[in-house]
């Protein structure tokens, strides 16, 4: 189905819908993974020094308790309790950081210093997500897309991540986009929600209006059942 959508400066977006609704396909379109058969995809990444989607849009897909489907999941699976000595330290994986001001800001926000000399396989689920966010944000993207950031977390770690993301949303140069399956996962810092269902991308709505509309709809469905 055709999609007309804009993400404006100052907005933090949640793309919400059930599994299989088409959320991942929408993200693929937004990031330019697939060429459009029709229409135009336009970016404005100012004040970034580069205008490429590769440099300015970073995507993290969380799959399970151990973080994600990409590099960090690989780290956790590659080393186990029998070969901990070969596992890298957080410090080594973060590498050299050229932007000292950004490093200090992110290390303070995510409390990275106490983790630097820990081995990657010994991080808790919450620590691993903070590590991955820090590593990604050290590249200074304009847009950070997180797919299922709360999956596999206990209540305390979920609350911690909520608080960290809320602080992250206050960074003037960063727009956050969350891809979520559950209505109740939409954090308070989210300004707008894009509902996706059965391959159809709905109209972007303000968060309060979305929650009101979809809770009423779900209540009607329950009564009908």
Kindly label every feature range from the protein language model.
Residues 27-99:
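ABC ATPase nucleotide-binding domain signature region
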Residues 144-148:
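Catalytic Walker B motif of ABC-type/P-loop ATPase nucleotide-binding domains
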Residues 182-188:
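Conserved H-loop
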Residues 98-115:
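Conserved ABC ATPase "signature" region
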Residues 133, 161:
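Hydrophobic anchor residue at the start of the ABC signature
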Residues 196-223:
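Conserved beta-strand-loop-alpha-helix hinge in the C-terminal portion
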Residues 119-123:
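Conserved ABC ATPase signature
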């Amino acid at each position: 189905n055709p999609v007309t959508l804009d993400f404006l400066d100052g907005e933090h977006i949640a793309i919400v819908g059930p599994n299989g609704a088409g959320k991942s396909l929408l993200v693929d379109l937004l990031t330019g993974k697939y060429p459009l058969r029709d229409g135009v995809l336009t970016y404005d990444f100012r004040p970034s020094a580069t205008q490429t989607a590769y440099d300015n849009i970073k995507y993290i897909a969380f799959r399970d308790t151990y973080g994600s489907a990409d590099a960090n999941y690989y780290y956790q699976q590659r080393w186990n309790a029998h070969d901990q000595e070969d596992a890298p330290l957080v410090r080594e994986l973060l590498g050299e950081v050229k932007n000292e001001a950004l490093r200090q800001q992110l290390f303070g926000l995510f409390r990275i210093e106490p983790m630097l000399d820990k081995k990657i396989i010994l991080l808790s689920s919450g620590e691993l997500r903070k590590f991955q966010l820090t590593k990604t944000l050290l590249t200074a993207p304009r847009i950070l897309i997180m797919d299922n950031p709360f999956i596999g977390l206990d209540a305390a770690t979920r609350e911690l991540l909520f608080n960290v993301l809320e602080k992250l949303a206050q960074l003037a140069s960063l727009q956050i986009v969350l891809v979520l399956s559950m209505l109740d996962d939409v954090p308070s810092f989210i300004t707008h929600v894009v509902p996706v269902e059965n391959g159809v991308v709905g109209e972007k709505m303000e968060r309060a209006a979305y929650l009101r509309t979809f809770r009423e709809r779900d209540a009607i469905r329950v009564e009908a059942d």
